[in-house]
Curated annotation (Swiss-Prot):
This is DNA replication licensing factor mcm-4. SMART domains: AAA (SM00382), MCM (SM00350). ATP 2 binds at residues 430, 475-476, 577. Residues 21-67 have a biased composition (Polar residues). The gene is mcm-4. Coiled coil: none annotated. Component of the mcm2-7 complex. The complex forms a toroidal hexameric ring with the proposed subunit order mcm2-mcm6-mcm4-mcm7-mcm3-mcm5. Interacts with nmad-1. Acts as a component of the mcm2-7 complex (mcm complex) which is the putative replicative helicase essential for 'once per cell cycle' DNA replication initiation and elongation in eukaryotic cells. Core component of CDC45-MCM-GINS (CMG) helicase, the molecular machine that unwinds template DNA during replication, and around which the replisome is built. A motif (Arginine finger) lies at residues 601-604. It holds the Pfam family MCM4_WHD. Keywords: ATP-binding, Cell cycle, Chromosome, DNA replication, DNA-binding, Helicase, Hydrolase, Metal-binding, Nucleotide-binding, Nucleus, Zinc, Zinc-finger. One of its GO terms (molecular function) is ATP hydrolysis activity. The lineage of its organism: Eukaryota, Metazoa, Ecdysozoa, Nematoda, Chromadorea.
Length: 823
């Protein structure tokens, strides 16, 4: 815009965005000077819309002669009143005026005529029709508070006004793509000057509502624009976007408590009790200096209970992993939610925010008015569009169409649906069919049983899986695939994870100076999957927090006076390597990966992935790996996989709509299988099943029913789940000395045969110590037992000594041992 000291400066680019007739600056300037008292809105650099919020920008230029209806202030727009920053130009000086010669209202510093904007938007509301609607836009709430489909033969936004009348809804979501299709000029005005234009659009909406229904709601209807074409990622935000309408996507990492923000202050004179209301603009409130009633100065006091406050919440939005360059730290931005938008998002939600990008000056010294050259940026939210928790890694938030649902139902009727979907899990990884079936069950999950009305114990539906084995067997690749597939998933490495990073940390908020709880990976992965790589390298303090999460699905916090219990209903998918970088088949799983047995027993499936030496297997694997880098002429057969997008929609639809329950036949069959496993181990003095294994079998059976899109678990589902569960046990819970399955390895860390060997060693040690006089060194005692029995092992001997020491059957003094006589 030309300034008074530089008349030759060209007009700003923002003024050319709108399809309006051109006008001479001198005419507008003379008209505005005539009304505003010789102060031209263009005579200062602060009149630009991009610098809105400065001291000059907070001066209202609305003439008292305006006959336009006023609307209520909106906290999310950061303005004091609807007539903020407007100027009235009389007909003689207004080249864009009509034949009536009446004065018209313009947004200060622009060529945006308020009457033209309102007329165009009224036409849009009353005439705009669209046949293709997204699924989250084609439903409306009726008198009975039930959802009804919108009639596309009527104007779309008039149907939305009908919803406001029937269901007492006080907001309308404005799809800016609809506005752009109707009038590109009006769309650009909303994008460039949202704080100035949207309040007048609110007036039009309320006027049209009153004309059609002959009533007014208790609260004014507000517009919530979304789906702007000017969508930016956080790294793309720049000074050109300040005070403009933007749309960005990200993940919510933290939400503050509700903050009461003053919108209107009531000041009362301490001498004569005369009251004056003062509007708050951009967080600033001007205290009256002189009382107009008694003429005293500096005598006003703020009365809080007569002031107007508005709910406010600070939402920390973090850059989405899809938009983040590799090796970079994620960017964050503060989003301010006002009014009905507060408490609408939770940490871990992936959302799309439409709002006004703000830049606020920071003081060099809190006691001085001087501002630093660096400004703090934030976003005043106008609309939150939350991605459904059952949706998978899509940023547009669109739901599944009817055509896609029919395609999903047709796919579920295939007899080999389990194998077809399993082969589509990480198709570039060769074989590992059982592991892929287990991952498929993890993606679908079981049926949640948390009905509080029945006073029953809550049982988890999430399935936990551990992948262990030799390095280079695609364990991390499978974790990465699952992480990219699910919406509320978190990926972390055991070496770089701490207990605070997994659970929650307490920090002091920079704005409110209060202690706040910052949630970690397990809480952010609520209703999703937490992928933990290098599980064996995680320190003990970080690993100990998983015990409660993997069974109770909650996380108890007691830090710095903050005591709470957070939901962590997340499936845990972990990968671990053996101790010596090579799996030793002569050792149990507890000895190979040095994980506590209390944690191992909480995994539903433990898969052992070993790099076996087999020439034919190596040749097939080599051909598969080479085919990933070299494309042949199509001579080799290609396996048809389910399309990735179809697989995502299939899982989302099943998790949202299918909740299978056990049938009578399936219940009896599960009990028979459980008793069969118990009896099979009892013959050899081993335990092959615990109640936790029974619950795992039920969850796996429910997951198989979900894969078929069945609301009932059949006997065939139980049979397939039992086969998968048995194959996993054969790999992970086999006693190396006997070759039989022994679940006691997972439950107690030692097999039944190992327990018997330790008990026999305890008897031999006590027999030797009873005949010895005084203390005997453990080395000499072991050599004595070794000479009598060549099969004696040092590990069994040490375990026996520890057991006897716990029972206080022996007395130890360093390396010396003696028999403990009874008192």
């Amino acid at each position: 815009m030309p300034r008074s000291n530089d008349p030759a400066e060209p007009q700003s680019e923002s003024a050319d965005l709108f399809a309006e007739p051109s006008s001479q600056h001198s005419s507008m300037r003379s008209g505005s000077e005539q009304v505003a008292g010789n102060m031209s809105p263009r005579s200062t650099s602060s009149a630009s819309a991009l610098q809105y919020g400065s001291e000059m920008g907070s001066v209202s230029q609305m003439s008292s002669a305006s006959t336009l209806r006023r609307g209520g202030p909106r906290g999310d727009l950061g303005i004091a009143a609807v007539d903020h920053r407007t100027v009235q130009i009389r007909g003689m000086e207004d080249e864009m005026a009509g034949d009536d010669g009446q004065p018209r209202l313009y947004v200060w510093g622009t060529r945006i005529c308020v009457a033209d904007v309102q007329r165009s938007f009224r036409d849009f509301l009353t005439t705009f029709k669209i046949s293709q609607l997204a699924e989250d836009e084609n439903m409306m709430t009726g008198h009975d508070e039930a959802l009804h489909e919108i009639d596309v033969n009527h104007p779309y936004y008039m149907e939305r006004l009908l919803e406001c009348n029937d269901a007492e809804v006080t907001h309308i979501n404005l799809n800016l793509k609809h506005l752009n299709a109707f009038s590109e000029a009006l769309y650009r005005k909303v994008i460039a000057y949202p704080a100035d234009v949207i309040p007048y659009l609110d007036i039009v909406v309320n006027e049209v509502f009153a004309e059609r229904f002959n009533r007014t709601l208790a609260q004014s209807i507000e517009l919530r624009p979304f789906n702007a074409q000017k969508t930016r990622n956080m790294r793309g935000l720049n000074p050109n976007d300040v005070d403009q309408l933007i749309t960005i996507s990200g993940m919510v990492t933290r939400t503050s408590s509700l903050i009461p923000e003053m919108r209107s202050g009531y000041f009362q004179c301490a001498v004569c009790a005369f009251g004056i209301e003062s509007e708050v603009d951009k967080g600033r409130i001007e205290e009256p200096v002189v009382c107009t009633n008694c003429s005293n100065t500096h005598c006003f006091q703020l009365v809080h209970n007569r002031s107007v406050f508005l709910d406010k919440q600070v939402v920390k939005l973090q850059e989405s992993p899809d938009d983040m360059p590799s090796g970079e730290t994620p960017h964050t931005v503060s989003v301010y939610a006002h009014g009905s938008l507060v408490e609408s998002v939770q940490p871990g939600d992936r959302i799309t925010v439409t709002g006004i990008f703000r830049a606020t000056g920071m003081k060099v010294n809190p006691k001085q008015r001087a501002l630093a050259s660096v400004y703090r940026t934030s976003i005043d939210a106008l609309h939150f569009r939350k991605m459904d928790t059952s949706r998978l890694h899509q940023d547009n938030g669109e739901t599944i169409t009817e055509e896609r649902i029919q395609q999903i139902i047709e796919l579920s009727k295939r007899p080999d649906i389990m194998d077809a979907l399993a082969q589509s899990i990480a198709p570039s990884i060769y074989e590992h069919d059982d592991v892929k079936r287990g991952l498929l069950c993890l993606l679908f999950g079981g049926t949640r049983k948390d009905d509080e009305t029945t006073n029953k114990t809550k049982l988890r539906s999430e399935i936990n899986i551990l992948l262990c084995g030799d390095p280079g067997t695609s364990k991390s690749q499978m974790l990465q695939y699952v992480y990219r597939l699910l919406p509320r998933s978190q990926y972390t490495s055991g070496k770089g994870s701490s207990a605070v990073g997994l659970t929650a940390s307490v920090s002091r908020d920079a704005d409110t100076k209060q202690l706040v709880l910052q949630t970690g990976a397990l809480v952010l992965a609520d209703n999703g999957v937490c992928c933990i790589d290098e599980f064996d390298k995680m320190n003990e303090s970080a690993r100990s927090v998983l015990h409660e999460v993997m069974e109770q699905q909650t996380l108890s916090i007691a830090k710095a006076g903050i005591i709470c219990q957070l939901n962590a209903r997340a499936s845990v998918l972990a990968a671990a390597n053996p101790v010596d970088s090579k799996w030793n088949r002569n050792k149990t799983i507890v000895e190979n990966i040095t994980l506590p047995h209390t944690l191992l027993s909480r995994f539903d499936l433990i898969f052992l992935i070993v790099d076996a030496q087999d020439e034919m297997q190596d040749r097939r694997l080599g051909n598969h790996l080479v085919s990933l880098y070299f494309e042949n002429d199509g001579n080799q057969e290609k396996t048809e996989h389910v399309d990735m997008n179809l697989l995502r929609d299939y899982i989302a639809y099943a998790k949202a709509n299918i909740h299978p329950k056990l049938s009578e036949e399936a219940s009896q069959f599960i009990i028979e299988k459980y008793l069969f496993m118990r009896k099979a181990g009892a013959q050899h003095g081993q335990i092959t099943a615990y109640p936790r294994q029974l619950e795992s079998l039920i969850r796996l059976s429910e997951a198989h029913a979900k894969i078929r899109l069945s609301q009932e678990v059949s006997v065939d589902d139980v049979e397939k789940a039992f086969t998968l569960w048995r194959e996993a046990l054969k790999q992970s819970a086999v006693d190396p000395s006997t070759g039989r399955v022994d679940v006691a390895i997972l439950a107690s860390g030692m097999s039944a045969s190992g327990r018997k060997a330790v008990e026999a060693m305890c008897e031999a040690v006590l027999k030797q110590l009873k005949t010895a006089k005084g203390f005997v060194t453990s080395k000499a005692l072991f050599h004595t037992l070794k000479s009598a029995d060549k099969t004696c092992q040092r590990e069994v001997f040490d375990e026996a000594i520890n057991e006897l020491s716990k029972k206080e059957s022996i007395a130890r003094s360093g390396d010396r041992i003696r028999f403990q006589t009874e008192a």
